[in-house]
Amino acid sequence: MSSGIPCMWMRGGTSKGGYFLASDLPADPAERDLLLLSIMGSPDPRQIDGMGGGDPLTSKVAIVAPSRRPGIDVEYLFLQVFVEEGRVSDAQNCGNLLAGVAPFAIERALVTAQIGETPVRIFMQNTSQVAIARVKTPNKRVTYSGDARIDGVPGTSAAIAVTFEDTEGSSCGAVFPTGQPIDTINGIEHHDR
């Protein structure tokens, strides 16, 4: 019998996936990715032999670790586990799973909960940016019950407010990809908003 790997499975925004401590996974990315493919059941359109839901929105992974960066609580690496391919990608970020990083960090004792609300400063490794997630923590415990609604998700839950620091140009290096607020291409003005 295998010993297993601790994992917290939860929804973040309109996605859901597995939240792991980095220390519980292989340090070698190739080994780690093979393990995650197995956990999710990929490649298979139904992911029948794993925990994935046969949809990119339910085949996601958050890897969380304590941070050594000044002023940062935790590091977050997002991985998309492809459903029908034996592939794992860190080429993008996921704001949906980001919303679950703070409650996970509190539940796994990476961050000490405060009375009422706990801010968690998160370094997003995929984009080298910082987000601050605020989690409701009455009695110093995460609450998942609340009246917040989001499109695409039935029911209500506790709101998690997320703010981002210094995100301008995180994907292309500039606020405006071409450096201009308006570009004319083939005689047509394109406004970059």
Give the location of each predicted region.
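A glycine-rich beta-to-alpha transition motif near the start of alpha/beta enzyme domains, typified by
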Residues: 1-193
